[in-house]
Amino acid sequence: MKKLLFLGALLLSTVCMNAQTSEYYQEAANPIATNPALWAKVTAPQISWGSTDIRYKKEEPAPIHSAQKSMNLTAWKGEKISAQLVVWTPKALNDLTFMVSDLTSGSATISKENIRTGFVRYVITDELNKDGLGACGYRNSADFDSTLVADVIDHITPTLTLPANSTQGGWISVNIPQGTKAGKYTGTVTVKADGITLSELKLNLQVKNRTLPPPSEWAFHLDLWQNPYAVSRYYNVEPFSKKHFDLMRPLMKLYADAGGKVITASIMHKPWNGQTYDAFESMVTWLKKADGTWYFDYTVFDKWVEFMMDLGVKKQISCYSMVPWRLSFQYFDQASNSFKFLDAKPGEVAYEEFWMNMLQDFSKHLKAKGWFDITHIAMDERPMKDMQETLKVIRKADKDFKVSLAGTYHKELLDDLNDYCITIVEKFTPEEIEVRRKAGKVTTYYTCCTEPRPNTFTFSEPAEAEWLAWHSAKENLDGYLRWALNSWVKNPLQDSRFTAWAAGDTYMIYPGARSSIRLERLTEGIQFFEKVRILKEEFEEKGNKGAIKNINKTLKMFDESSMDKISPTTAVNKAKKVINRY
């Protein structure tokens, strides 16, 4: 047993790298020089409500001609809703801070404890490929324009110093308790700097007499792949130690609070080779004993799954991957006391024997834990022959194993896949979606570096992230997948660029459990998906065909082929007004 414990530690070892572990940090220098001429007409600090649709440029005055001192929002009970204020100043401001009051409606109150403020901070980004058609492929940062962009929502830093001739956004999020009384609530956001009040902004919130269920009960199937190894590297802690889990808890809670449904588990060494800055290691120890039999240790896998379930992510476990990018499988060979690799591909006897041993043992373990029914053996898109051969092995190991695929549309795989996710440009037929839904199967879509928009790069329009969930509603799909929640780059708080794909492609949350404009807007879209679902169910029960027709007409705006005619920003804002009327 001691040898096995040592082996587990060995498999979890990681190269110690310097990481910025302090929760207070300096932003990267702005690669774009400030143009004094743009600031010539700004003679004093300006404060206004802005728009969550805009990433305000640090080096330019906010494009607001008349300061807006009052903001009107509408929400359901149980909803989280956000607004953005903006400060731009010709002179330096010290100790800039935002303070919120309670929101009141007669004797009813939404406590300020349910309101979070944060600075919208800046990170380096880049751009699409030069042809503008996507963002895939390895890239040299020198070949792309780099700028600072507003994305990080920093709720940790209490005050900031704002240099002269610069702009700073502030993000205000209100979590409306489910037991809140319907009505119009009012409160204030006070902006202070240098010990004095610069402005008081009024916040008006209309709470409708409708209730959104908690995120754990949302129907929307959100699958953002988690990378625990990035967290251990960044903070220089032992993977899956108590310290590691303590650091991950608030990070992964962001995912749970967004309605995350799927736990990402790596059951073999580097399922995606080395495509991320921090490679995924195996959460399962593979040991070939001296007598030729196999031993599998699930200690790390179990810890990880239990940790995520405790946060409320418990609908599905996706295990990657029997068909990795590189068909080479690592295990520890006791006879030689060394790591070895088996090079084999689906359809070969060696491949089948290798995976049969593991899957049969894994099946027993999952059943003992009570997790078998929610566990999926997960794959990325691979050649059809490889996927079909892999399915044969899975079914031979245990005919009841569930299988998921994020890839392209293959009609011949519809019945075999319990969770099927295809590209945004491909379409399931309405009949296929309904047949799968009645069978309890999940049907979703994904975006990646291929799509110029809609997307969630750090330079993408904020509304694009929200548009994604509306599109799921329009297509009658169950949800959305994006491959990376937190596969951080070297210095994620300063520079979101990576050696492959556009900036921000690899992560949506930041160290310190800082959210992003992208995640907040994606979550708002998911909330509206739930609103649409709830309203349509109600109207179908009541026979309100007119309301259903109106909602379906509204959803037609969320077509990826018509974004040049109706931008994501326009579509989202129009649709929200329609839904919030009910």
What do the PLM-derived regions correspond to, one by one?
Residues 1-22:
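Bacterial Sec-dependent N-terminal signal peptides
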Residues 461-507:
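Substrate-binding cleft of secreted/luminal carbohydrate-active enzymes
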Residues 145, 166, 174-175, 186-193, ...:
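Aromatic-lined carbohydrate-binding surfaces of glycoside hydrolases
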Residues 19-273, 372, 565-582:
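Mature N-terminal, pre-catalytic/accessory segment of carbohydrate-active enzymes
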Residues 401-427:
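Aromatic- and acid-rich polysaccharide-binding/catalytic face
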Residues 437-466:
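Active-site clefts of carbohydrate-active enzymes
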Residues 77, 244-247, 296-300, 385-386, ...:
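Short, glycine/acidic-rich beta->alpha junctions
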Residues 330-331, 339, 343-409, 493-582:
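Catalytic domains of carbohydrate-active enzymes that cleave complex glycans
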